[in-house]
Amino acid sequence: MAVLWFDGLLARVADAGVYFLPEDDVDELLEAAAVNRFPCLRVNLAGCTGKADLLLRIAGVFAVPPHVVQDWDQLAPALERLRLADSAGQVLVLEHSEDLRAAALGEFKAAMEALQAVSADWAARDLAFWSFVVLDETQFDALG
């Protein structure tokens, strides 16, 4: 994909949500986020095997004390408090999710639903919250 494609996509608040992203497209996404002046945070999920660890890693990249986000329903309010006032959007990139998907697929799905809810909440205020789960191209078929 091209930076121009991502640039246009990120500007469309109504389309913001959770998406799977091929590894080869990460650099273009990061560049498009910079063009749009959207903060882009990356979460390395290598070795992550459950909800508590996942929430801890997300809290860590947002520099939120771990006790602030201990469940999915606490995620949206925490992220809203951290939103930069002059930014029309935010990009979250989740990388190396293989271990989590293998060990706790239900928690992975719950996380995606929570992030989708954050996107919907932000979109209601004309703000874009994008989440991208980076996958190797061969993993797309396994998602079903």
Regions found by a protein language model. Give the residues of each.
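Positively charged, polar, low-complexity stretches
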Residues: 2-144
